[in-house]
Every structure is written in structure tokens, then in C-alpha cells.
Amino acid sequence: MKARTAGFPGVEVATLLAPGHDDLTGPFWTAWPAEPLLLIALIAAAGLYGLGCYRLHRVVGARAVSSSRATAFFAGIITVALALLSPIAVYSERLFFMHMIQHLLLLLIAPPLLLLGRPLVPSLWGLPAQWRVVLGQLLVPGRPLARLGYLITTPLVAVAAFVITIAVWHLPVFYDVAQGRTFMHDLEHLLFVGTALLYWWPVIHPTGGQRRLSYARALPYLLPPFLESMLIGVLLTFADRPLYRTYVDVAMPWGFTAVTDQQLGGLIMWIPGGLFFLIPLIGLLMALLRQEDARAPGSPPTASRQPTS
């Protein structure tokens, strides 16, 4: 498909309304996808959050939303844009390893950043007052919507949804179907982001209050996707033939073959993908050991100190 010009000299905008781009002869940074609806949605989400932060600041003061949380949320929005609205999205249709980079951004980077911003309250405050009241009532604990939200963010449900989603969409039959049909590809990305938000929810706990995952429970919670990422990465890295038909008969840029491209994609999923779980696992293990040391007989009674008034 011919690339379209967006009115900027030297910048090509590849249309993603149908699969397959033939114009990848220019520099990497010149291939930009045309996704106006997604761009509008991301701008709207950022604007809603920003407006809510402003209103909360006027009502509550500087304590409403910290700058670090706001920065995390906007970084999450930028990460989604980087995955879906940058040359990465265009080149992911030709290069498997680019698609794996896109998946890492959507699964392991953007969702935690969005949740670290604690987006629920600021986003509600970004809405008109009438809408805020209606949605606030729906989210009152005990209401059906609140119960559903509690159910789907329970650790067992969240980790199962996350692991199954990753496994299914990396099976060759589903992967090739998604790459060949725009609707299925969009559905894949939607499920990636949605289940990733569910998965990271119990870890980050963006609503405050009592945590649902202790350090001891968080360790086994992080293991299934860590092992899954390692396994899929190893299988892709050491496969001696292309596993996905999508990349067999396409002209690959930069001198890649289907096998070398797949091997690099496997390494990306194996090593960087594994590190995104391994680093939190090590951090949780160290925190758990410190917690156990504090409980050991003869340890300093720091936990019993009372705050001064």
C-alpha cells in the first residue's frame, strides 16, 4: 500500500486501515501510521486526567495528585503512543522483532506507568459534575460494577487472564490471523493492554487502602508470566525455521531473514521481557527478607515505635 503524506516534508504516514505497507524504503523515523481515532483517544485520556488533577488541586491542594504520579500516568500515555503511533507500529508489520518491542511496551511498560498514576479519581474529576456523580455511585463498594471490578482484579483471575492472553496470541495460528486482519490486530492490542492492567493492578494497587498482595504472595504471583516469557523467548530464539507465515514472504528491511528476525524477537522477549519480571521478583524477595529480619527475635523494635503528635 502506498504511504500518504501528512503535510510534513520528508515524513511518510503509512495507512494502517489495511495490513501491508510497501513503502519502507526511507529512514526509520519517516514511517508514521495514520491512526486519528487512537490519537484522539489518547489525547482525551490525557486531557481528562490533567483536568481532573487541576480540579482536585483547586479543591484539595497540592496533596491531591503528586507530580511523580502525574508524570507516571503521562509517561504511560506516551508509551502507548510510542507502541501504536510511531514507526515501531509500521515496521512491526514487516519485522517480528519490532512486533515484540511493541508487545513489551503494551504489556510491561505502559500499564504499570498508567496505574502508578492512580488514574481513577483524577479521571472522574475530569468529567462533568453530573457524570462524576453517576459513575461515582456505580463504583460504591457493594454495587454490581464495583463487585465486578473487585472480581477481575483478584490475583488468581488477573494472572490467569494475563498469561492466557499472551499464550494464545503468540500461537502461530492466532498470530498470523491478527497480522492479516486489522480488527483482530486491534483486538489483540486491546486485550494486551486490558489484561496487563488487570495483572499489574494487585501489584501496584492504584486505589490505595489495604493491599491484596503481601510480599510473600506477590513472589509466586510474578512467576507465571516470567516463566512464560522466558519459555516463549527460548523457543523463538532456537527455532531453526520461521514459525509465523506472516514474515515468510515479505521483503524485510535492513537485510533480515525470517529466521534471524524471529531469533532477535525471541531474544527480546526472553531477556528484556524476563528482566521486567526478574527485577521486581528480586526486589520483593529482598523486601520479604528485610521483613522477616525485622520480625526475628532480638531485632530492633522499630515497628513498635509510636508516631509523635
Regions found by a protein language model. Name each.
Residues 2-309:
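Alpha-helical membrane segments of multi-pass proteins
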